[in-house]
Amino acid sequence: MTNPISGTNVREILAQTVFGAVGNEAMEDLVRVARIEHFKLPTLLSAAGESPTHLRLVISGHVELVTRHISGSEIVVGHIAAGGWVTWLAVFMTQAPTHDFCISASSSCLALPVKDVQSFCVQYPEIYPMVIRMIGHRMRLLIEWTGQSVLASPVQRMAKLLSVLAQEQNRQTDQNGVTLYVTQARLAS
C-alpha cells in the first residue's frame, strides 16, 4: 500500500522492522491502519501524563524526550533518531510516560495506533522476543552507564555517557558514523 499523501510505501517500511518477521500477509492489518506523518514545525506528539495513542517509527528527523526541572524549565533528556521507535512502552504499559515526546521540524514518521499494535502482538506472539531485545538493548546501556558512574570520575562519566548515546543512536540508524544530538543542558541533566 502506498500512503496517498506522501507516496511512501508503508509496507516496505514495515517490512524492514520487527513486523517484517511475520511476513507480508500478517502485516496487512497494520498496513491498513498505518499513516505517514510529516511535521514542518517542531510538534508535541504526546504530553507528559498522557498515554501515547500511536507507536511511531521515526523516518527522518528526530524525537526529543523532554522533562521538566523542579524550577519548571524544560530539559531534553534523550533523542530518538531515524529508525527508532516512539515508544514501545505505550503498547505494553498502562501508566503514562512522565515526559513529553516532541518531534523536530522537517521530520517524518510512520504512525500505528497503539490498540492495533496490541492486537497484532496478541495475534503474533513471536514478535515479543524481538521487541524485548530492542527495549533490552537500551536498558542494558542505561544500567551499564549508571553502574559505572558510581565508580568513575566526572570526566569518565561524561565520556561513558557520550559513548552510550552514540551506541544507541548508531544502532537506530545502522550507520558507521553518527551525528550525536547533544546539548550542554542535556549533558548537565
Regions found by a protein language model. Name each.
Residues L165-S189:
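Phosphate-/nucleic-acid-contacting segments
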Residues M1-E168:
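Cytosolic regulatory regions built on CNB/CRP/Popeye-like sensor folds
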